[in-house]
Amino acid sequence: MSVDTELVHPVADDWDEAAAAEAKSTLQQVLSASHLLGSNRALANFGGGNTSAKGTATDHVGREVPAIWVKGSGSDLATMSDRDFTPLKLEEVLPLFDLAEMSDEDMVAHLARCQLDPAAPRSSIETLLHAFVPAAHVHHTHPDAINAIACAENGKAFIAECFGDDAAWVEYIRPGFALAKQVGAAVRENPNLKLVVLAKHGLVVWGDSAREAYEKTIAVCSQAAEFVNVKAADRARFDGATGTVSLGEAERGDTLTQVLPVLRGAVSADGTSKILIADLSPAATELVDSVAGPTLTQVGAACPDHLVHTKRLPLWVAFDPGADDLGTLKQRIRSGVATYRDDYAQYFAENASVNDQMAD
């Protein structure tokens, strides 16, 4: 490999026993583990993934009842507080496993009635996935190492090769009742199972403690990273051909100083000022310098999780430092952004549901 011998980096185990010892309650324990998972973006993008813990809680009349706390909608693992978990009455949730099917609307309405605290956040669409896995702690993440395999065309075979009988594979299905039941059934039917991989989605692991579930996530992701790196070791990235030569550091800085304001102005034309972040990493420049770059960037997102943070396709702006001047580049940026905006508006109009609204 031309840039980095590791296509996917192993994930460090950041468990802090001293900090964990301060987490006395079940809720504090799952919160501590959530912060560790969310602080590593190789495990979960902003807002992605969710965690849960089962235990007992006091209901509104003072009774101790079996409960499950699940990360609620709208929070991020890295920064969430205990108030971002939704506590539910477990005995009113578990019977749903025996149903053959359930609509999203019925599921959401049922879970709302199961909440121990009506003021808690709305239940995650993946609440039942956590409830149906018979373990005290369940961690669901979207790790780079796992999705590098799970998003591959032959991902199922690769997962079997990497993990053997330790893993179950679930074909892609939108989060909701059906996915939760498939995951729950896989775990219940095989007590020796250690992980479930969701195609084009992510990873589910579990344990008797927050630490066990967290460290299993780390171990599984490290094993997947090693597998991917070995498989990719002798393969050239991006077809192995260079299309353009990167600018030197000084010239690159001068070029960015001149063109970034043009790009910022173009993407802020709707009246909403944008902030730009330039990724100058070797991995990024290897892609944009490659012959295959213009084609590969237009394939589409590898998994739905990416679409939460990006649009369907990126804008590719052609630029050859050896042949094009900055005036040409600036004009391509302006016209490219304008065309992209029109194309996206048409795409949205053709695919939007009745109540969908375009955010930007």
Which stretches of residues belong to each language-model region?
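Glycine-rich flexible loops
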Residues: 1-360
